[in-house]
């Protein structure tokens, strides 16, 4: 499967999922905190699925373009005010506490992730002889799985609450000890799964 077909397939799959999740929020009153995390995991596992089962030859430039695929995947959300279908899709990620900056936070979150992952991957391959694809996947899993489990667990089981600041803002957000522990435990599990990357 070539690059273009793969990216179009991922794009369509993401948007079908977005529409389903948006309808869950609209018709079934499912909490956005849950649907947003399903989105969160889809941005990790959909590309991973295609990379595993439908690989294609990745040159340096193609790999870089592919790593920025989330930009054009999320881009249609910019036009949500003009299209009711896109509005419905947006419901699945639009947390009340993020409004009116929901899309800005999404773009900056993923751009910042790429800015961290790429240098780490390059340094790991050049100085430690670890394939950049492996270390890149490791870092992505650390960030997305840890954070992905924190919010649903905190919302469903959280009893012990505390407030903390988000990065680069003075706004305080409510978090739970249970959610934070879920992030810690799932992050440690990712480290265990990827233990083969580390030296003794």
Where are each of the predicted segments found?
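Interhelical loop and helix-boundary elements at the membrane-water interface
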Residues: 2-8, 21-62, 74-200
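Alpha-helical transmembrane segments
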Residues: 10-17
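Selected alpha-helical membrane-embedding segments in polytopic membrane proteins
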Residues: 68-74
């Amino acid at each position: 499967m070539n690059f273009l077909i793969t990216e179009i397939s991922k794009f369509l799959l993401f948007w079908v999922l977005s529409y389903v999740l948006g309808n869950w929020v609209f018709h079934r009153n499912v909490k956005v905190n849950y649907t947003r995390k399903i989105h969160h995991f889809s941005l990790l596992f959909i590309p991973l699925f295609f990379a595993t089962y439908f690989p294609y030859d990745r040159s340096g430039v193609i790999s870089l373009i592919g790593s920025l695929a989330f930009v054009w995947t999320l881009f249609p959300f910019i036009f949500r005010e003009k299209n009711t279908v896109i509005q419905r899709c947006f419901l699945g990620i639009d947390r009340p506490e993020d409004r009116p900056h929901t899309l800005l936070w999404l773009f900056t979150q993923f751009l910042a992730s790429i800015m961290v992952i790429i240098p780490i991957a390059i340094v790991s391959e050049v100085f430690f002889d670890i394939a950049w694809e492996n270390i890149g996947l490791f870092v992505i899993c650390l960030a997305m799985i840890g954070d992905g489990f924190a919010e649903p667990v905190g919302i469903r089981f959280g009893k012990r609450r505390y407030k903390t600041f988000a990065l680069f803002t003075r706004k305080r957000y409510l978090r739970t000890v249970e959610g934070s522990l879920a992030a810690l435990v799932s992050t440690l599990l990712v480290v265990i799964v990827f233990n083969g990357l580390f030296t003794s």
